[in-house]
Amino acid sequence: MKLTCVMIVAVLFLTAWTFATADDPRNGLGNLFSNAHHEMKNPEASKLNKRWCKQSGEMCNLLDQNCCEGYCIVLVCT
């Protein structure tokens, strides 16, 4: 009996926590799909195109390989 009560309280708590921490409970998936569709129609609106990268001759990071073109060799983009 105690275990059943604990389980019911836990489920109610987790359900309330899920709704309380949701970003936008009203039409959340609709807004997500709408934004994705807009980015497909207008590729320049995509966040992926706003990638920060280094041009040739600039200092770079060997771990991230953050050169726009070429490779990061001896901390300089080639």
Swiss-Prot record:
According to its UniProt entry, the function of this protein is described as: Delta-conotoxins bind to site 6 of voltage-gated sodium channels (Nav) and inhibit the inactivation process.
Q: List the disulfide bonds.
A: 53-68, 60-72, 67-77
| Protein name per UniProt | Delta-conotoxin-like Ai6.1
State the family it belongs to: Belongs to the conotoxin O1 superfamily.
Q: What's the domain of life for this entry?
A: Eukaryota
Q: Which residues form the signal peptide?
A: 1-22
Q: Does the keyword Disulfide bond apply?
A: yes
SUPFAM superfamilies per UniProt: omega toxin-like
Subcellular compartments: Secreted
MF terms (GO), sorted A to Z: sodium channel inhibitor activity; toxin activity
A single Gene Ontology CC annotation of this entry is:
extracellular region
According to its UniProt record, where is this protein mainly located? secreted
Kindly give the Pfam families that the UniProt entry links to this protein. Answer: Conotoxin
Which InterPro entries does this entry report, sorted A to Z? Conotoxin (IPR004214), Conotoxin_d-typ_CS (IPR012322)
Instruction: Name the keywords, alphabetized.
Output: Cleavage on pair of basic residues, Disulfide bond, Ion channel impairing toxin, Knottin, Neurotoxin, Secreted, Signal, Toxin, Voltage-gated sodium channel impairing toxin
Per the record's keyword annotation, is Disulfide bond included, yes or no?
yes
| Expression sites (tissue/organ) | Expressed by the venom duct.
Q: Which residues form the propeptide?
A: 23-49
Q: What is known of its domains?
A: The presence of a 'disulfide through disulfide knot' structurally defines this protein as a knottin. The cysteine framework is VI/VII (C-C-CC-C-C).
